[in-house]
């Protein structure tokens, strides 16, 4: 069974026991998180339920396995011949989740 969830303004396709990295959400390591904004749910051999915009009664349960930072992104701009250079860096904080269960009532 798979589902498409909405988290942090992005969409992720998840299966049971899959591991995903999403934008940081608060929580302790090992704590459970439930997602109720499910855009689509289905099985590979049967037709899927597509939400309008979300599937009512569908819940995805996940466990927080790690809190980490992504690789550094460099933003650089310059103007030629003017000695104008600006450099900025950013490291996005991420949360790693293990999907435990996908249910639809």
From Swiss-Prot:
Pfam families: Ribosomal_L21p
GO biological process entries: translation
Source superkingdom: Bacteria
UniProt keywords, alphabetically: Ribonucleoprotein, Ribosomal protein, RNA-binding, rRNA-binding
PROSITE patterns attached to this UniProt entry: RIBOSOMAL_L21
Single annotated GO MF: structural constituent of ribosome
Entry's Gene Ontology cellular component terms: cytoplasm; ribonucleoprotein complex; ribosome
Role of this protein: This protein binds to 23S rRNA in the presence of protein L20.
HAMAP family in the cross-refs: Ribosomal_bL21 (MF_01363)
Family recorded in the similarity comment: Belongs to the bacterial ribosomal protein bL21 family.
Subunit architecture: Part of the 50S ribosomal subunit. Contacts protein L20.
Name of the featured protein: Large ribosomal subunit protein bL21
This protein's encoding gene: rplU
């Amino acid at each position: 069974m798979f589902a498409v969830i909405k988290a942090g303004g992005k969409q992720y396709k998840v299966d049971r026991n899959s591991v995903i990295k999403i934008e940081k959400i608060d929580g302790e390591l090992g704590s459970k998180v439930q997602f109720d904004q499910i855009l689509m749910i289905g099985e590979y051999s049967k037709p899927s339920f597509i939400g309008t915009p979300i599937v009512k009664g569908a819940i995805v349960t996940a466990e927080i396995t790690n809190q980490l930072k992504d690789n550094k992104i460099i933003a650089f701009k310059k103007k030629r011949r003017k000695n104008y250079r600006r450099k900025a860096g950013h490291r996005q904080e991420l949360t790693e989740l293990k999907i435990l269960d996908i249910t639809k009532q």
